Every structure is written in structure tokens, then in C-alpha cells.
Amino acid sequence: MRYKNIAVLMTALDSESQAVELKGIEEFGKSRGYNIAVFVWYTGAFEKEKHNTGEVNIVNLPDLSLFDGVIVFSNVFHIEKNRQLIEDALDKLTCPIVCIGCRLKDYYSIHTDNYTAMRKLVEHFVVDHKVKDIHFVKGIEGNEDAAERYRAFEDVMREHNLPILPERISQGDFYV
């Protein structure tokens, strides 16, 4: 019997949530007789471009076409150039691909509905607590999840005729 081989692409192995998710993947794989190969690199939102490019190129080291499936953690996509490099590598594959934490092309995905979650949170402050002066901290520019959260904030504020003042909007440096 041939074992199934699953590749996991991720960064931030030091992230508690990803360590827990990876442990779950490994335990499930072991219980089913799958081989799990984890490819980890470090790319940070504040690193030098050459560093990020070099690190993300680790995805090109294994021959991903030899795997029966690929799992991709979304934190690899917080830099657009990295996203494109990963997409290029994945586009060549015929095996199932699952993205955790993001939507990517037509691949299977497990992700959070950031818009609905933020909308409910802002509505809770505005309706239940009668808060009118809200300071919003945005995520990294160009991050789809951050944009969805900010759009939800704007929508609720407008629906309740509350001001969205530039001095109450801060640019954050996080991507999750």
C-alpha cells in the first residue's frame, strides 16, 4: 500500500495557533497513514525584500507535484510578491490544495468571515454600549482580511450616522 504524502507550506511556526493546527494535521495524518512534510520559512512584514524573496523561494525546493495534497497557511500571503510566488508554484499542481485562513483562487479554503465578525463587534459597541467615538486600527495595507474588517467598520459607522474621522483611524502593522 502506498502512503499518501501531504505537503504543508507555512511560516511563523512560533505562532501558538499555527503550532496547534500543525499538530492536528500531523496527528490526523499519522492516524490515516499519511506522510506529512512541512516546509517552513520566515517572512515578516517588516523584513527586507531580498530576505522575503529568498525565504519564500523555499517553496520551490520540493517537487510539489510528487505530493497527493498541499495545505497552505494564509500567513504566507501577507506580502503580495510572496503571494504571487506561491500562486505560481501552486498553479502547476493537479493535486487538491487547501488554504487555511484565506481564500485563494478556486482552491478549497478554511477561513474566517472577517467582515461579519467585525460588523457584529462594531454594532455591539454602537448599539449595546452607545459608543460614538471609535478609534479603528487597520491592518497592513493590501491585506484582504484587514480591508474587509475596515469596510465593516465603515459600513456600521455610516449606517448609524457616526463620523469616520481620519484622526481616529490608525494604520496598524499586523496582518492577522
Per-range role (PLM):
Residues M1-K48, G54-V176:
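Bacterial carbohydrate/catabolite-sensing allosteric modules
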